[in-house]
UniProtKB/Swiss-Prot annotation:
The EC number(s) this enzyme carries: 4.1.2.13
Source organism of the structure: Staphylococcus aureus (strain bovine RF122 / ET3-1)
Active site: 175, 212
Xref: InterPro entries: Aldolase_TIM, FBA_I, FBA_I_Gram+-type
GO terms of biological process kind: glycolytic process
Name of the protein described by the UniProt record: Fructose-bisphosphate aldolase class 1
Record key words, sorted: Glycolysis, Lyase, Schiff base
SUPFAM superfamilies registered for this protein in UniProt: Aldolase (SSF51569)
Catalytic activity reported: beta-D-fructose 1,6-bisphosphate = D-glyceraldehyde 3-phosphate + dihydroxyacetone phosphate
PANTHER family per UniProt: FRUCTOSE-BISPHOSPHATE ALDOLASE
């Protein structure tokens, strides 16, 4: 583990850019960027277009390591290059800590939750991540209803996989998303917090994790989890809120920083000039940084 990157993730001022839309969500991300499905004829072309978009983001002067602590990449992005370097090396050289999305998507809903599908190639994927100088990973589950068994299952699965990731020398981001429209969202979050605490308490002193959570209904609910000795940092997802709304809610949570995807890229368009693109990205970065650093 890179100690300098660990220090940056633990104490740095800023947020994490989530650039990890995978195959399933790529057409939607491209469409929002202004590229329709009739502009590519196969998956290779689609992934090339999305890599071009990500390259445009990470090479922009607005994508500044003074504001952006880390970036989460999709597996394809890890194996591609930006300006002649593998993406993770390009980011690390720029001062941005690289993470890799490792999950294979969500299973069918059961007990009010969606567990992760099995990650059958996890070992070899983590070996490749180490070869590509990746610092940490991210994997997402989804909680839709107040169901204690379901929430327990989500957290247990996350920690089980997290321990395999830690054993390979990487820092896992555990992401049990709570759907922002869930009927009993505040109650779900209390149950989730208790289960997360159990999981964290089961770790050895040298087993470090990060958490990526939905912004809680009750402000500062996760403050004591953020102070847990095994937690490097807690980041939050935008989860379907507009950027303005997500930023506003984030400002009420002292220890939390953003890890936004859609909310970061929502004003970026393929047809923008370099100046327009850099300004749109810069405005987004500035507002998300502000919500992550300057609290109410």
């Amino acid at each position: 583990m890179n100690k300098e990157q660990l220090e940056k993730m633990k104490n740095g001022k800023g947020f994490i850019a989530a650039l990890d839309q995978s195959g399933g969500s790529t057409p939607k991300a491209l469409k929002e960027y202004g590229i329709n499905e009739d502009q590519y004829s196969n998956e290779d072309e689609m992934f090339q277009l999305v890599h071009d978009m990500r390259t445009r983001v990470v090479t922009s002067p607005s994508f500044s390591p003074d504001k952006i602590l880390g970036a989460i990449l999709f597996e394809q992005t890890m194996d591609r290059e930006v300006e002649g370097k593998y993406t993770a090396d390009y980011l690390a050289d720029k001062g941005v800590v690289p993470f890799l999305k490792v999950d294979k998507g969500l299973a069918e809903e059961q007990n009010g939750v969606q567990l992760m599908k099995p990650i059958d190639n996890l070992d070899s994927l983590l070996d490749r991540a180490n070869e590509r100088h990746i610092f940490g990973t991210k994997m997402r589950s989804n909680i839709l209803e107040l169901n204690e068994q379901g929430i327990k299952d989500v957290v247990e699965q996350q920690f089980e996989v997290a321990k395999q990731i830690i054993a390979k020398g990487l820092v896992p981001i555990i992401e049990p998303e709570v759907n922002i429209n869930a009927k009993d969202k505040a109650e779900i979050e209390k149950v989730l917090k208790a289960e997360l605490k159990k999981g964290l308490d089961s770790l050895n002193a040298d087993q470090l994790v990060m958490l990526k959570l939905t912004i809680p209904t009750e402000a500062n609910l996760y403050k004591d989890l953020a102070e847990h000795p095994n937690v490097v940092r807690i980041v939050v997802l935008s989860g379907g809120y507009s950027r303005e709304k997500a930023n506003e809610l984030l400002k009420d949570n002292a220890e939390l920083i953003a890890s936004f995807s859609r909310a970061l890229a929502s004003d970026l368009r393929a047809g923008q000039s370099k100046e327009e693109f850099d300004k749109a990205l810069g405005d987004a970065v500035e507002s998300i940084y502000d919500a992550s650093v300057n609290k109410n």
